[in-house]
Amino acid sequence: MCIRDSGSLAYICDLAKQDGNKVYISGSGADEIFSDYGFGGVKKYQHSNFGGLFPDDLTTIFPWASFYGSSQETYIAKEEHVAGSFGIETRYPYLDKYVVQEFLSLTPELKNAKYKSVLFNYLTENNYPFCENEKIGF
């Protein structure tokens, strides 16, 4: 477990608890289903499985390790432990089977059109400010 990551999450959970919040919405799983840490076949990180280039036949890439393997188990364990220590429940919308199935049912052309095209289109259509092609996290 990365101390820096756990410390950052603990800080956020402490502030959330002080504000009376009881639920933390996690972003875990978003990178894995929307981009696989890459785009157009170019791996942005070493643990990318297929460089974000979704094939016509998904059976050629399933199950990919960063989504179904130890990465998610580690992230979830950290978030559950840290948030739980502040009495905050964690929810994982990007790990919901219906969200994953909906995204995976889209055509490869749509999924491969732009880096994280589904999120880009949603944020753009709703005039939500964001930094394009910039990953900010802890």
Where are these regions (language model features)?
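Conserved small/polar residues in nucleotide/adenosyl-binding loops
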Residues: 1-5
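Aromatic- and histidine-enriched alpha-helix N-cap/loop-to-helix transition segments
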Residues: 6-7, 94
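Short secondary-structure boundary micro-motifs
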Residues: 7-8, 57-59, 65-69, 75-77
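N-terminal glutamine amidotransferase
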Residues: 9-13
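Mid-to-C-terminal catalytic subdomains of enzymes
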Residues: 21-26, 30-45, 69-138
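A mobile, often basic/glycine-rich helix-loop segment
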Residues: 34-66
